């Protein structure tokens, strides 16, 4: 969950825009766990760790990364036997964010959905992103942008899409909802005051639900359920909930034990009430049927290069049902000012290829708007390849729901003691596919194969235990299966 070369972190206030779990694991079979957030530091080959909120536990479960992970996840993050709806895994997902940003509106959302079908992409889940609502905390569509939202959702359903809506725990401070929630005591308060705290976040300054108050929690849940009934919405993209928004030094909450990470936990726990869910911030809920999206990646090669190591980390924290952000990136400011003809088409295609052999893939920037015919056909090919892999990916998701095993696996997890400890650019998709994507602008890459005999995507057989350099034209995603 940490940035490259992280030497220290405080999980009470830092989540690096991603999911976190109070767990450190070693490929030597050891792990460290704490029920509460901890601060740790790596220096001179030693780990210094401290926590004010829990007992720090450490154990040796064996001699490998797999043994350490399975022991820790089985004890602290046990799988439930339940997984998110199959559609998350079997079809591509689509999100209106990069195309519309804050101009979410009925006409353009329907146009985006029709373009998905017209360009030959499979239908799946469609997420309507931020600024569809009248105010934060108000779950009514803006009438100036959505003249008939129920009809829009029904039309999207008729096209073959499931529909999810962006929501957050924030409440606009000059809204009718704010006044009501303030009266009821449902909002996080300023430290030492009975007045709601106004918290800074990426869209401004807002009040925020205090989900440690059971009545506030139930009110928000009921409001979301009612919206589902009124507009036929299938589920929600639960954004925000980051622990740094609830600092103990600055706010008061209903349950005085529920600051920072506990509010993150309660926000994510709310998602268990809605099978169609997606989270970016999450705390200590590995093994649960919650869909996790990696934090927003920039439209850049650095963003592409971060996908594999970040997905591996998510799996090792118990978050198997994960999506590697949006194809090409989800950090909208990195897309601004770029003409449709000015995009790095190679970057988009390589990002799409990586997504295609992940548990989930999600489009946002419209490939048909920014790619030439040949590269568009390549993206369609890999969207359909993900669809073809659907049954296999779903089988691995079902396995994760029973055993807790990651779907995206570190090479050292699958092949211990073969020199893969530092490998961050290839991975196993379940127990079958070794995936070695291109994550830079070049057309060659080096692949290290485990012992045994391996066959690649072109049918060529290789002797394992060796390193190979492959030619990888833009139309190709290298993957291997072991020949028994």
List the predicted regions and their residue ranges.
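Residue-level detector of short, conserved catalytic/binding motifs and their immediate flanks
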Residues: 19-23, 28-30, 92, 275, ...
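Active-site pocket-lining segments that scaffold enzyme catalytic pockets across diverse folds
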Residues: 104-107, 111, 126-131
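Aromatic- and carboxylate-enriched substrate-binding clefts and catalytic-loop regions
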Residues: 1, 122-379, 383, 412-415, ...
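Generic recognition of flexible, low-complexity loop/linker segments
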Residues: 9-12, 19-21, 81-83, 114-116, ...
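N-terminal small/glycine-rich loop or linker at the start of catalytic domains
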Residues: 84-99, 195-208
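Catalytic and substrate-binding clefts that recognize carbohydrates or anionic sugar/phosphate headgroups
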Residues: 1-88, 106-118, 413-415, 469-483
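Carbohydrate-binding surfaces of carbohydrate-active enzymes
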Residues: 115, 120, 142, 155-162, ...
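Short, glycine-/Ser/Thr-/acidic-enriched flexible segments
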Residues: 30, 37-39, 99-100, 133, ...
């Amino acid at each position: 969950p940490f940035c490259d070369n992280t030497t220290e972190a405080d999980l009470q206030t830092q989540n690096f825009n991603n999911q976190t779990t109070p767990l450190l694991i070693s490929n030597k079979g050891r792990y460290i766990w704490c029920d509460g957030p901890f601060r740790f530091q790596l220096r001179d080959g030693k780990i210094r760790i401290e926590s004010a909120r829990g007992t720090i536990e450490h154990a040796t479960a064996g001699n490998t990364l797999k043994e350490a992970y399975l022991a820790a996840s089985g004890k602290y993050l046990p799988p439930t036997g339940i997984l998110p709806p199959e559609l998350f895994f079997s079809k591509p997902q689509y999100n209106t964010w990069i195309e519309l940003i804050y101009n979410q509106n009925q006409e353009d959302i329907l146009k985006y959905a029709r373009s998905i079908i017209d360009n030959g992409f499979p239908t799946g889940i469609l997420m309507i992103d931020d600024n569809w609502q009248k105010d934060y905390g108000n779950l009514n569509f803006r009438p100036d942008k959505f003249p008939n939202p129920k009809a829009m959702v029904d039309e999207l359903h008729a096209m073959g899409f499931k529909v999810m809506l962006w929501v957050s725990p924030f409440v606009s401070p000059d809204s009718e909802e704010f006044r009501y929630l303030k009266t009821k005591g449902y909002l996080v308060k300023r430290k030492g005051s009975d007045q709601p705290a106004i918290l800074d976040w990426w869209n401004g300054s807002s009040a925020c639900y205090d989900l440690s108050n059971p009545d506030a929690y139930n009110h928000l849940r009921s409001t979301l359920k009612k919206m589902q009934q009124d507009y036929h919405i299938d589920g929600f993209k639960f954004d925000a909930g980051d622990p740094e928004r609830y600092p103990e030094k600055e706010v008061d909450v209903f349950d005085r034990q529920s600051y920072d990470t506990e509010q993150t936990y309660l926000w994510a726990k709310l998602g268990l009430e809605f099978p169609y869910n997606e989270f970016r911030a999450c705390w200590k809920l590995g093994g649960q049927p919650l869909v996790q999206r990696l934090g927003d990646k920039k439209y850049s090669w650095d963003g592409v290069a971060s996908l594999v190591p970040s997905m591996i980390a998510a799996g090792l924290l118990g978050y198997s049902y994960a999506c590697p952000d949006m194809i090409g990136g989800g950090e909208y400011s990195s897309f601004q000012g770029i003409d449709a003809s000015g995009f790095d088409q190679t970057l988009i295609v390589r990002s799409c290829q990586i997504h295609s052999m992940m548990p989930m893939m999600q489009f946002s920037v419209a490939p048909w708007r920014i790619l030439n015919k040949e590269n568009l056909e390549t993206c369609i090919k890999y969207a359909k390849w993900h669809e073809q892999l659907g049954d296999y990916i779903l089988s691995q998701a079902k396995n994760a729901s029973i055993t807790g095993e990651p779907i995206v696996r570190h090479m050292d997890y699958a092949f211990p003691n073969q020199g893969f400890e530092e490998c961050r650019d290839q991975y196993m998709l379940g127990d079958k596919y070794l995936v070695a994507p291109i994550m830079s602008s070049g057309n060659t890459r080096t692949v290290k194969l485990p012992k045994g005999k391996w066959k690649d995507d072109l049918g060529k057989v290789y002797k394992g235990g060796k390193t190979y350099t492959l030619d990888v034209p833009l139309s190709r995603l290298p993957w291997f299966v072991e020949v028994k």
